[in-house]
Amino acid sequence: MRPAPIALWLRLVLALALVRPRAVGWAPVRAPIYVSSWAVQVSQGNREVERLARKFGFVNLGPIFPDGQYFHLRHRGVVQQSLTPHWGHRLHLKKNPKVQWFQQQTLQRRVKRSVVVPTDPWFSKQWYMNSEAQPDLSILQAWSQGLSGQGIVVSVLDDGIEKDHPDLWANYDPLASYDFNDYDPDPQPRYTPSKENRHGTRCAGEVAAMANNGFCGVGVAFNARIGGVRMLDGTITDVIEAQSLSLQPQHIHIYSASWGPEDDGRTVDGPGILTREAFRRGVTKGRGGLGTLFIWASGNGGLHYDNCNCDGYTNSIHTLSVGSTTQQGRVPWYSEACASTLTTTYSSGVATDPQIVTTDLHHGCTDQHTGTSASAPLAAGMIALALEANPFLTWRDMQHLVVRASKPAHLQAEDWRTNGVGRQVSHHYGYGLLDAGLLVDTARTWLPTQPQRKCAVRVQSRPTPILPLIYIRENVSACAGLHNSIRSLEHVQAQLTLSYSRRGDLEISLTSPMGTRSTLVAIRPLDVSTEGYNNWVFMSTHFWDENPQGVWTLGLENKGYYFNTGTLYRYTLLLYGTAEDMTARPTGPQVTSSACVQRDTEGLCQACDGPAYILGQLCLAYCPPRFFNHTRLVTAGPGHTAAPALRVCSSCHASCYTCRGGSPRDCTSCPPSSTLDQQQGSCMGPTTPDSRPRLRAAACPHHRCPASAMVLSLLAVTLGGPVLCGMSMDLPLYAWLSRARATPTKPQVWLPAGT
């Protein structure tokens, strides 16, 4: 006799319930355990609580807070631990008109946040994490706060990822992965005798190698989801780069890239039109408008005296450029010095230096990963920890945090200088060694940055001979009095068109009104080009938080052959920053989850301790960009007095950056390139997000309910996974890329920034 269909379904459900959650990628869910105590809020204080306790058999254990509104009750007739609440006492309390709120208490799982050292056999070799090096990257300090990258998705754009690797498989995320070399969903690397396609797997392990599994080492964000994009193992075009950088922008939080143009000391090259558009769309629309985080290795051309300001990827304002240092704090032989580098993590130098431990091809491990290729993924993992601590950080917030969490420490260089706001900065190291503990601490208390402003100053538009040494000075108001006026700088660009008889002999510098001198490009002896720079954009981060008003000085100096000649045709100074004085901002706490005093069954906050706004699981001092604060009335049940109104953060309309309400006419500021209509209160411009509803990646594999996730996943397989589960590449861009793919493009060869 065949079992009835219902019985089959029940067996299936039971079987799924017995499957180990880790085996199918689900987070374990613990049922609440109810205890024999209650918290109650009454309107008439201790006298009413005593009457209530006598009537229903409770013991009054006294007030919870000194003001006498909340009380702790216990009932001796209720079992100490139960999987179900006591419905009888619940009904008694609910019917009592003097009880404003009550909650039967449940056991809370808490652990002491001492430093838990991973048991992975090669963790002892991870000197940059295990406190063997001093200073290390303070990874243990971040872990001791309970942070591990949970809920954060990182994708490594490289030559593929060994998705079945013993140290990666459990964290592998297929939605954050794709093969753009062969156009299929499988990013598995192509195996060769020389193991040339090991790069992506090595970088992925640095970010999210599993912890405590008895294998290899551990990743910085060992509970983050990790994906890989195979895009370097074949002919690379502008289309492939743009598609890789646009993969799942509402699902992937961080893209890590350790590649770029050739580090040969003579190349000046950068992203094409489509890739620049992908960067722009990523920071304006990615992560729900908070902005995708692009982490980039600064380059390995030090042996050829290369300069990463001649690399248009690492000197983009949209990427966070990471340099390298050795265990001893020395400049590695391959390191490039340039003004666009923001921060530094560890790698190695000479062959005898300890290197980086990570995953390797053929399910192996290696302790010989090096180059800036090794530094950028370490930074990506640390940034994943910061994003877990505060998921509402924008892409610019994160760059501000990295500036503040990077310190000179023991890093050795002759060019350390103090900029106009008192920070030390170097062309080799940016603002110094990134400290994960300081990064997450600062992230928790960070006040959202005001909208980005851009002020363009056309300084030179007529041909000017370049003498052996010339200075071009311009008194800049930083657009004072206009809607785009800037008080505190972030990125500064100098866009130059010039000719020169031997390009590599020309040193270009920029000095701010506050006296900070930044070398935009130093001499490059191997660059013998006579082409000069055609509309090339140099970028410096050395003026961060300075006031831009005053005289800016561009210096051009011949450092080589005496008879070199050239002409400067155009020079535009591009200032990016904010209207806020960042040096004067308060240091009070902004984000905290411990301030939540009441949660629902799903962990969402229902009440905060003190004047704060509720946003999901957090209590905020004020709402981040894309949200507005308001009060929401709470309907009281029959016989209950009205509960106080909740202070909450609600979503702005998609077209707004900041707002005073949820309507498209409630905007108070706009995303970059959009214009605010002051009278209408609306944003108009090309970057206004499309209002069409989109399927989100979160709707499938990371659904809050595992059963729902499985149903949606089965439907996705049946009906076409990418369509249902949120292959959320922006549709206009996807159509644009599809058309561009049919257009022949000149093949380009990019080299990984390490081995």
UniProtKB/Swiss-Prot annotation:
Peptidase S8 domain segment(s): 126-440
Record family assignment: Belongs to the peptidase S8 family. Furin subfamily.
Subunit structure: The proPCSK4 form interacts with HSPA5; the interaction takes place at the endoplasmic reticulum.
Purpose of the protein: Proprotein convertase involved in the processing of hormone and other protein precursors at sites comprised of pairs of basic amino acid residues. In males, important for ADAM2 processing as well as other acrosomal proteins with roles in fertilization and critical for normal fertilization events such as sperm capacitation, acrosome reaction and binding of sperm to zona pellucida. Also plays a role in female fertility, involved in the regulation of trophoblast migration and placental development, may be through the proteolytical processing and activation of proteins such as IGF2.
Signal peptide bounds: 1-25
SMART domains assigned to the protein according to its UniProt record, in alphabetical order: FU
Active-site feature positions: 158 (charge relay system), 199 (charge relay system), 373 (charge relay system)
Molecular function in Gene Ontology: serine-type endopeptidase activity
Cellular component GO terms, alphabetical: acrosomal membrane; acrosomal vesicle; Golgi membrane; trans-Golgi network
Tissue: Placenta.
UniProt membrane topology term: Single-pass membrane protein
Propeptide positions: 26-113
CDD domains to which the protein is assigned, alphabetical: FU (cd00064), Peptidases_S8_Protein_convertases_Kexins_Furin-like (cd04059)
InterPro entries: Furin_repeat, Galactose-bd-like_sf, Growth_fac_rcpt_cys_sf, Kexin/furin, P_dom, Peptidase_S8/S53_dom, Peptidase_S8/S53_dom_sf, Peptidase_S8_Asp-AS
Organism name: Homo sapiens
Positions of transmembrane segments: 709-729
Glycan attachment residues as annotated in the record: 475, 629
Record key words, sorted: Cleavage on pair of basic residues, Cytoplasmic vesicle, Glycoprotein, Hydrolase, Membrane, Protease, Serine protease, Signal, Transmembrane, Transmembrane helix, Zymogen
Residues in P/Homo B domain copies: 449-581
Highest taxon above the source species: Eukaryota
EC number: 3.4.21.-
Protein known as: Proprotein convertase subtilisin/kexin type 4
Record localization: Membrane; Cytoplasmic vesicle, Secretory vesicle, Acrosome membrane
Pfam families assigned: P_proprotein (PF01483), Peptidase_S8 (PF00082), S8_pro-domain (PF16470)
GO biological process annotation, one example: peptide hormone processing
